[in-house]
UniProtKB/Swiss-Prot annotation:
SUPFAM superfamilies: Ribosomal protein S16
Signal sequence extent: none
Keywords associated with the record: Ribonucleoprotein, Ribosomal protein
Cellular component terms (Gene Ontology): cytoplasm; small ribosomal subunit
Basic and acidic residues bias locations: 99-113
Keyword Ribonucleoprotein attached: yes
Protein name as it appears in the record: Small ribosomal subunit protein bS16
Name of the gene encoding the protein in the UniProt record: rpsP
Family matches, as Gene3D superfamilies: 3.30.1320.10
Length: 126
């Protein structure tokens, strides 16, 4: 059985409240779970200590048993110092594409040609 530590939504319409639960990965989001290990209330201010509540001992126990936290829960655990989250780094994504580089080179070449033509015109006028 693949276990996940994930969020189960509660609360009313437009007022979300989440329980952090350990559940079988195949069960529905708000369906059957094995144990409640915390809660998250996104309606509270970010600096409010009640915004994220975690039962550290239970979470460590379930992670030792092989439960995998989802991305959002992993962020909470990393913030609390219960798990490490790999730093995301994709420097190639920030680079401009091939066509954009061609356009920049073309624009630079036109600017150099225009400057050279202006210099030649200025020297010919003297």
């Amino acid at each position: 059985m693949a276990l996940k530590i994930r969020l189960a939504r509660g609360g009313s319409k437009k007022r979300p409240y989440y329980q952090i639960v350990v559940a079988d990965a195949r069960s529905p989001r708000d369906g059957r779970f094995l144990e409640k290990v915390g809660s998250w209330n996104p309606m509270l201010a970010k600096d409010n200590p009640l915004r994220v509540e975690l039962k550290a001992d239970l979470i460590k126990e379930w992670i030792a048993k092989g439960a995998q936290p989802t991305d959002r829960v992993l962020r909470f655990l990393a913030e609390a110092g219960l798990a490490e989250r790999a730093a995301r780094s994709n420097p190639e994504k920030a680079l401009p594409g091939k066509r954009a580089l061609e356009r920049v080179a073309e624009k630079k070449q036109k600017a150099e040609d225009a400057a050279a033509a202006a210099a030649a015109e200025a020297s010919a006028a003297e």
